[in-house]
Design a protein with these regions (language model features):
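Conserved short histidine dyad/triad with adjacent acidic residue
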Residues: 30-33, 43-59, 93-94
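Short, charged/polar surface micro-motifs in flexible loops or helix N-caps
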Residues: 38-40, 49-54, 71, 116-117
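A short, N-terminal "cap"/entry segment at the start of jelly-roll beta-barrel domains
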Residues: 1-41
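Conserved hydrophobic/aromatic beta-strand scaffold that supports enzyme active sites
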Residues: 5, 44-46, 64, 89
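Short histidine-centered beta-strand/loop micro-motifs
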Residues: 55-59, 76, 82-83, 101-102
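Ligand-binding loop in jelly-roll beta-barrel domains
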Residues: 94-117
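Short acidic-glycine-tyrosine-enriched beta hairpin
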Residues: 78-94
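Short, conserved beta-strand element in jelly-roll/cupin
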Residues: 49, 58-74
Length: 117
């Protein structure tokens, strides 16, 4: 068995993330790390949303998100709605349509099973 070294990125939360390029929505998303296994790809990084228009996102992959700063208001098409604060963890199944909003700003760390950005 070949030993592989782990990866480390100091203060990754401070990296400037690329815009999601959704007109009228102040949202940024970037992959910090991408796994090497192409068959079971995992991408992890940060998502930032600022006050303004809501972001509606259709998931075609599984994702977990942990709120690391600020407060998200998150809802789905089933009528479920939560106010997620620092330390809260969310799971978005493939096929879900999620609406993200915030009264000020929020940052989440995500880990998703999808193709890299």
């Amino acid at each position: 068995m070949t030993t592989k070294a782990f990866k480390y990125k100091k203060q990754a939360i401070k990296d400037q993330q690329p815009s999601m390029n959704v007109p009228g929505v102040a949202a940024w998303l970037g992959d910090t790390f991408i796994s090497a296994d192409a068959d079971k790809r995992i991408c992890a990084g940060f998502f930032r949303l600022e006050k303004g228009n809501k972001l509606v996102y259709d998931y075609d992959y599984e994702e977990m998100k942990c709120v690391v700063d600020g407060t998200f208001i998150i809802s789905d098409e089933t009528g479920q709605k939560v106010t997620a604060t620092v330390g809260d963890v969310l799971y978005f199944p493939s096929g879900s349509r999620i609406t993200f909003e915030t009264a000020d700003y929020a940052v989440g760390f995500f880990c998703g099973q999808r193709v890299p950005l």
